[in-house]
Amino acid sequence: MGKPIVAIVGRPNVGKSTLFNKLAGKRIAIVQDTPGVTRDRIYAEAEWLNYKFTMIDTGGIEPKSEDIIVSQMRRQAQIAIEMANVIIFLVDGKEGLAPADEEVAQMLRKSKKPVVLVVNKIDKLKDENNAYEFYNLGIGDPVTISSSQALGLGDMLDRVVEYFKDDESDGEDDERINIAFIGKPNVGKSSLINKLLGEERLIVSDIPGTTRDSIDSYVDTEFGEFTLIDTAGLRRKSKVKEEIERYSVIRTYASIERADVCILMIDATEGISEQDQKIIGYAHDINKAILVIVNKWDLVEKDDKTMDKFKKELKVNLSFMPYAKYLFISAKTGQRVVKVLQTAKECYDNYTKRVKTGVLNDVISQAIMMKEPPIVGTKRLKIYYVTQIGTKPPTFIFFVNDPACIHFSYQRYLENQLRENFDFQGTGIKLEFRERKEK
């Protein structure tokens, strides 16, 4: 089911993220010289010889380290190995064989998964002799590459796809709905995703900011197939000191751009912040479907009016997106968690909704009869025809006598009429006006 999964594993700093980014063709994993900088799995789609597959970049495995983050990275890598169809075991040809390599090899042998041993950092022909000592790992013939110079990658990928050539290379997967979970650090994004997935998929610990990068997880449910993107929490600029944090802020915005639905998570005990408004404002500006989730609702003292009051306050602070859907949950206790993906799917359905042209024009004709367009200057707006030209978000073109005659208040009226007649809750809609000469 689905595309084959290829996991890139190995001890820290052997070049996994550099290789991953070369294969993905874009800078997906955070790459820095600090050991352990790729702290969680990151996914990307790849293709070679018409075979489509999913790659996983794992945090480096340090088998005997007691450091809390490293030990959690090791567990994450083990989960990636279990999920993978083929494993690329990356070692460092410059440093040579290390004890940690032997321990990783032992872990891979136990998995009984197909493994392609890849010796990285072989930048020159004369360095190829460095690969021989890795035969001692008992993993098979090594492939030599230089990920930084993109040398030998074709040979490596030939070996990888060899393992799933028997599988049918089907063309299209069912479309997955991309959902980005955004919000301040420690608002409960990773905890909610883990609850939805039913596995310890994301690093969750007491150390602030343990989701440094944006992480993808896949889940299939009765409501559809989803990609869940957990983003690093956005801090105020004064707190963003390390380079690593700057990368993560950029990645959060990039995650919003590739999402279909953005879920803003708010801490019920803290309420909405200026930072929350800023980040969801960006999602609104680039026309994403939006669901606002108030987490930690179990910690709030409440009566039967508390939720309505809280929602009313949120709507005031988020008045620029009156269409947003709201959900009050507790990721910790599981309260209403079952509704998260269902509600996100409703937002997505509205985000991709198409309205028949005949029905659309009937609604707009009725709206014009109820409220005639105002005169702007010396001309009155005439609407001849309207049609939907796209989705994500639903986009409508009105053919009119003069686009300059459209007053913002009348445009808002037309949008409200569309919303009243068709359910667009959870998504923005776009109205465009084009001139058409009257015949």
Swiss-Prot record:
GO terms for biological process: ribosome biogenesis. GTP 2 binds at residues 183-190, 230-234, 295-298. It comes from the Bacteria. Residues 353-437 form the KH-like domain. This is GTPase Der. Belongs to the TRAFAC class TrmE-Era-EngA-EngB-Septin-like GTPase superfamily. EngA (Der) GTPase family. HAMAP family: GTPase_Der. Residues 4-168, 177-352 form the EngA-type G domain. GTPase that plays an essential role in the late steps of ribosome biogenesis.
